[in-house]
Amino acid sequence: AVIENVPVFPGCDKGNNENKRQCMSEKIAKFVQRKFNTELAGDLGLSGRQRINVIFKIDKTGSVIGVRARAPHPRLEKEAQRVINLLPKMKPGKQRGKAVIVPYSLPIIFQVQD
C-alpha cells in the first residue's frame, strides 16, 4: 500500500515522500552503525558477512513499536531490537490527514572483522 505522507525521521522534512524515505533510510542506517555492537558477532564465533532482518512499526504518535528481528544468533536479534527501540520519535505517517501505523523493514548487514 502506498502511503500519502510517509513517516518523517528528525531532520528529514524536506522534499517529497521519496526524498523523505531515502533520508530516513540513511539516518536509520547511520544510527544503527553507531549504536549496534558489531563485536558481538565475533564474540559469538560468527565470521564473514552477517545479515539481520528487522521489522517494526511506526505508530500513530511516531514511536517505534513491535520490533522483531531475524538473525543467525538470538543475541544478535536482541541487539538489533535494542538498537531499533532507541530510534528517536518521528512524525507519524498520514493517510487522508489522519495519523496511521506504518510498517517498516530494514536489513542490518555488517562484516565481522577477524
Which stretches of residues belong to each language-model region?
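Charge-biased low-complexity segments
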Residues: A1-D114
